[in-house]
């Protein structure tokens, strides 16, 4: 029997939230500030829409045509119900990336967005996504991708490995993701309480774990406990997307474009 989850957490749903960076109109402002002419945005796509809040808001509040998929049928069902009661005309499916990206009825897109997807899927799925962008993004189109970066996420890599190792070896398979997350976090906290050398070298990791423990367990399961989890450097990210014939334009976070707020005079020089 094929595991349709491909190692992704599926026994519990993702959290409900709106992600403003997926808004093509917001992307237009970032591009204009960076000196780029944005596309019209008449055809848009979201890969991995979660509970579908963002894609439904964007479909209902704009004249753009939206196509999107999320392989979790429970989340796709909720997103479709949200579309039916809101009047949003989004085309929503529960297909895997491989299934969705090979469809012949999809238009070419001005905007393709992925939020919380890239770092949490396999290399095989990343290649499917890159090939899809290469074939279906219009000339002059925009891709928004959020991902966990190196070196910022580097201290969390061994911690995350311990979390999943504890889940795989120390908890019952049928106990469910929420219980497994809680048990793994308790283990990490006990480990850090004895002040290992790793905590001395990375003092901020203790506070980070304390902060993580306060977060929603569904979010944590999807953030840290999938089979695939790959923070990567900017250069590696650029290398992945190079074959799709796209390159970095601007950050979706407006304030990151303001050098005086983020860099010293010496760093700017």
Residue spans of the language-model regions?
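A short acidic, Gly/Pro-enriched loop at the edge of an enzyme's catalytic core
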Residues: 102-112
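Conserved SAM-binding loop of SAM-dependent methyltransferases across substrates and taxa
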Residues: 51-63
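Conserved SAM-binding motif I beta-strand of class I
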Residues: 65-70
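Rossmann-like AdoMet/SAM-dependent catalytic core
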Residues: 196-269
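A short glycine-rich, Lys/Arg-flanked "PGG" loop and its adjoining helix->strand segment in the class I
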Residues: 127-139
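Conserved alpha-helix/loop element of class I SAM-dependent methyltransferases that forms part
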Residues: 11-42
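Conserved SAM-binding strand-loop segment of SAM-dependent methyltransferases
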Residues: 87-99
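Conserved class I S-adenosyl-L-methionine
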Residues: 145-172, 180-184, 188-197
């Amino acid at each position: 029997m094929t595991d349709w989850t491909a190692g992704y957490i599926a026994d519990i749903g993702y959290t409900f939230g709106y992600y403003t960076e997926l808004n093509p109109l917001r992307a237009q402002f970032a591009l204009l500030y960076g000196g780029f002419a944005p596309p019209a945005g008449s055809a848009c796509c979201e890969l991995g829409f979660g509970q579908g809040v963002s894609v439904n808001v964007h479909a209902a509040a704009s004249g753009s045509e939206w196509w999107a998929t999320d392989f979790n049928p429970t989340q796709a069902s909720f997103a479709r119900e949200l579309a039916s009661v809101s009047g949003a005309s989004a085309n929503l499916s529960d297909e895997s990336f491989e299934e969705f990206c090979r469809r012949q009825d999809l238009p070419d897109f001005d905007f393709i967005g992925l939020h919380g997807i890239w770092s949490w899927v396999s290399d095989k799925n990343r290649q499917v996504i890159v090939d899809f962008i290469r074939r279906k993004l219009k000339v002059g189109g925009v891709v928004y991708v959020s991902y966990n970066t190196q070196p910022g996420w580097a201290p969390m890599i061994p911690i995350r490995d311990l979390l999943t190792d504890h889940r795989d070896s120390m908890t019952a398979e049928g106990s469910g993701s929420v219980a497994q997350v809680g048990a793994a976090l308790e283990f990490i906290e006990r480990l850090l309480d004895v002040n290992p050398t790793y905590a001395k070298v990375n003092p901020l990791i203790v506070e980070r774990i304390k902060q993580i423990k306060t977060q929603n367990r569904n979010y944590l399961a999807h953030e840290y406990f999938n089979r695939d989890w790959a923070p990567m450097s900017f250069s590696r990210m650029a290398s992945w997307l190079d074959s799709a014939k796209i390159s970095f334009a601007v950050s979706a976070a407006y304030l990151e474009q303001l050098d005086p707020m983020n860099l010293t005079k010496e760093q700017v020089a």
